[in-house]
């Protein structure tokens, strides 16, 4: 009966996750709680990032994995680290990070008001061969942070959520949602700042997206 109330993309995503057997991701009682403390969230994300480092045989620090406030109801997701991020050991750094900061400041979002991370944490050519691993990581990540809103930066991130191949000009500025177990996450897609650096003509579209996102979150948070 539930399926008739869900979009096809949500149904497909749920069915995909069921094939990965990720209905109960954490057995620890802490992770079953609806209201974790800031300290518990930090501990859990650190454990998650250790799992990623172990899988990738890397020693990246926490600044490479996230920025901002784990208690925020606003999560921002980029795609994968670029050379600046790897060199600086900091997520979305360099010119891309500078532009993102300006974009977020324009809608009064400083790093205490959001939690920023990626869906991928390496940039190897076979990265998509690890999609199952990264989908599992993302589900764990969402269950820890429990954001109400997720701002998706670019088509790679949006398509990762929806198992699709849409172009950013077709999907930017659009709301959607996913449901994982009983948790609902509202998503909104806009441009990756790295794309805007190469295609500045799309900055006006990005600004319209951000205003739309701002109006929604300040009305409901």
Enumerate the predicted regions with their spans.
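A polyanion-binding, active-site-adjacent surface
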Residues: 16-19, 23-221
């Amino acid at each position: 009966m539930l399926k008739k109330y869900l979009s096809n993309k949500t149904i497909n995503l749920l069915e995909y996750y069921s094939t990965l057997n990720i209905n109960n991701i954490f057995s620890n009682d802490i992770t079953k709680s609806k209201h974790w403390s800031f300290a518990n969230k930090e501990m859990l994300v650190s454990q998650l990032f250790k799992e990623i480092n172990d899988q990738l045989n890397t020693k990246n620090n926490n600044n490479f994995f996230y920025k901002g406030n784990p208690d925020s109801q606003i999560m921002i997701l980029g795609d994968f680290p670029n050379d600046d991020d790897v060199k600086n050991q900091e997520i979305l750094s360099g010119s891309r990070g500078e532009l993102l900061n300006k974009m977020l400041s324009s809608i009064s979002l400083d790093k205490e008001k959001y939690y920023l991370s990626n869906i991928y944490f390496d940039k190897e050519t076979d990265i998509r061969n690890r999609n199952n691993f990264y989908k599992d990581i993302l589900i764990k990540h969402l269950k820890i942070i429990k954001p109400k809103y997720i701002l998706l930066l670019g088509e790679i991130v949006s398509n990762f959520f929806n198992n699709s191949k849409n172009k950013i000009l077709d999907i930017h500025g659009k709301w959607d949602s996913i449901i994982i177990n009983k948790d609902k996450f509202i998503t909104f897609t806009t441009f990756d700042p790295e794309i805007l650096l190469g295609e500045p003509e799309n900055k006006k579209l990005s600004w319209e997206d951000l205003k739309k996102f701002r109006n929604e979150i300040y009305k409901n948070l």
